[in-house]
Amino acid sequence: MLSPIQTFLGQHNLDGFLFVGDSICDADMYYLSRFLAGDRFAILAQEKTTLLVSSMETGRARKESIADECLSTSQYQIMEKMRRCEKPEEAYLQVLLEFLQGHGIKRLGVPFRFPAGIYQSLLQDIEVSVSDSPASRWREIKRQEELDAIACTQR
């Protein structure tokens, strides 16, 4: 049986769905990762969930998140790229593209609130479509552990 993300990706003819932001402001990112971070990171939702975080957050992400895989931007030589690029954002965009290509992404979905600059950059190499976040729909239906936590909080 296909997982909800596999079903969503198949219905939309996508190789993955990407979130970039912080999980304090983006409930979908927290829902998918259970990793609470105020700094920007990326989540690639495919059959497995992969986080791309800064090297300072890698250990904590591996320990706290429910992601299948946690990768560091340093694995993609972000510091070397930063030395070569005029702007740090350009280095991050190169890392992100390398990360996505390494995960076989040719057709990518992103949520409506996705950062515009990153979206425009990715369009040069990847087919990107914007849609509602699948995680927003999944968050509407509470799992038993979530219902228990709500009940406990309301007592």
Residue spans of the language-model regions?
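N-terminal accessory/capping or targeting/presequence segment of soluble
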Residues: 1-98, 155
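Flexible, acidic/His-enriched mid-domain "rim/lid" segments that flank
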Residues: 88-155
